């Protein structure tokens, strides 16, 4: 297993990088998240995951250890391959993926191209406990945020608003200010609906 590679950056693209280590150029598949974090300088370091198949050895690179761990968790789910896991980490920030799994947010996971309702539910079912262990202290924040979101959505639904439309507005509000109280979420949502 190759844990990480440190060397000279030869080529950098949104889907891969080439890093030269001791005269050997390694082609490493990356996510958009990693692409945005890798500096354009010559000396770089990436954490790697090596996938060995009958016909190929493929390297996947990550700017952060946490992203690699999420990738490994995702590919452990039946029906989620390396391409789908990389697509998830390109479409969503690693933190958004873990929060969506921890809060059982099927819609967020399903928003990734190539993931249907069944796969999204399987990802949540298989990984929720593992993700909560990884999150540790942040688990409280996730569940609190999810509770505030659910309470605000229920209140807006009682007021006669469509749950789906209200959900989109509440998501935007929570992205701007994740620590919003239920009352402030409802007030801001009423202004935007």
UniProtKB/Swiss-Prot annotation:
<dbReference type="InterPro" id="IPR010994">
    <property type="entry name" value="RuvA_2-like"/>
</dbReference>
<dbReference type="GO" id="GO:0009379">
    <property type="term" value="C:Holliday junction helicase complex"/>
</dbReference>
<keyword id="KW-0234">DNA repair</keyword>
<keyword id="KW-0233">DNA recombination</keyword>
<feature type="region of interest" description="Flexible linker">
    <location>
        <begin position="143"/>
        <end position="145"/>
    </location>
</feature>
<feature type="region of interest" description="Domain III">
    <location>
        <begin position="145"/>
        <end position="193"/>
    </location>
</feature>
<keyword id="KW-0238">DNA-binding</keyword>
<comment type="similarity">
    <text>Belongs to the RuvA family.</text>
</comment>
<dbReference type="Pfam" id="PF07499">
    <property type="entry name" value="RuvA_C"/>
</dbReference>
<dbReference type="GO" id="GO:0005524">
    <property type="term" value="F:ATP binding"/>
</dbReference>
<dbReference type="InterPro" id="IPR036267">
    <property type="entry name" value="RuvA_C_sf"/>
</dbReference>
<comment type="function">
    <text>The RuvA-RuvB-RuvC complex processes Holliday junction (HJ) DNA during genetic recombination and DNA repair, while the RuvA-RuvB complex plays an important role in the rescue of blocked DNA replication forks via replication fork reversal (RFR). RuvA specifically binds to HJ cruciform DNA, conferring on it an open structure. The RuvB hexamer acts as an ATP-dependent pump, pulling dsDNA into and through the RuvAB complex. HJ branch migration allows RuvC to scan DNA until it finds its consensus sequence, where it cleaves and resolves the cruciform DNA.</text>
</comment>
<comment type="subunit">
    <text>Homotetramer. Forms an RuvA(8)-RuvB(12)-Holliday junction (HJ) complex. HJ DNA is sandwiched between 2 RuvA tetramers; dsDNA enters through RuvA and exits via RuvB. An RuvB hexamer assembles on each DNA strand where it exits the tetramer. Each RuvB hexamer is contacted by two RuvA subunits (via domain III) on 2 adjacent RuvB subunits; this complex drives branch migration. In the full resolvosome a probable DNA-RuvA(4)-RuvB(12)-RuvC(2) complex forms which resolves the HJ.</text>
</comment>
<protein>
    <recommendedName>
        <fullName>Holliday junction branch migration complex subunit RuvA</fullName>
    </recommendedName>
</protein>
<feature type="region of interest" description="Domain II">
    <location>
        <begin position="64"/>
        <end position="142"/>
    </location>
</feature>
<dbReference type="GO" id="GO:0005737">
    <property type="term" value="C:cytoplasm"/>
</dbReference>
<dbReference type="Pfam" id="PF14520">
    <property type="entry name" value="HHH_5"/>
</dbReference>
<dbReference type="InterPro" id="IPR000085">
    <property type="entry name" value="RuvA"/>
</dbReference>
<dbReference type="InterPro" id="IPR012340">
    <property type="entry name" value="NA-bd_OB-fold"/>
</dbReference>
<dbReference type="InterPro" id="IPR011114">
    <property type="entry name" value="RuvA_C"/>
</dbReference>
<dbReference type="GO" id="GO:0048476">
    <property type="term" value="C:Holliday junction resolvase complex"/>
</dbReference>
<dbReference type="GO" id="GO:0006281">
    <property type="term" value="P:DNA repair"/>
</dbReference>
<dbReference type="GO" id="GO:0006310">
    <property type="term" value="P:DNA recombination"/>
</dbReference>
<dbReference type="Pfam" id="PF01330">
    <property type="entry name" value="RuvA_N"/>
</dbReference>
<keyword id="KW-0963">Cytoplasm</keyword>
<dbReference type="InterPro" id="IPR013849">
    <property type="entry name" value="DNA_helicase_Holl-junc_RuvA_I"/>
</dbReference>
<dbReference type="GO" id="GO:0009378">
    <property type="term" value="F:four-way junction helicase activity"/>
</dbReference>
<dbReference type="GO" id="GO:0000400">
    <property type="term" value="F:four-way junction DNA binding"/>
</dbReference>
<feature type="region of interest" description="Domain I">
    <location>
        <begin position="1"/>
        <end position="63"/>
    </location>
</feature>
<dbReference type="InterPro" id="IPR003583">
    <property type="entry name" value="Hlx-hairpin-Hlx_DNA-bd_motif"/>
</dbReference>
<keyword id="KW-0227">DNA damage</keyword>
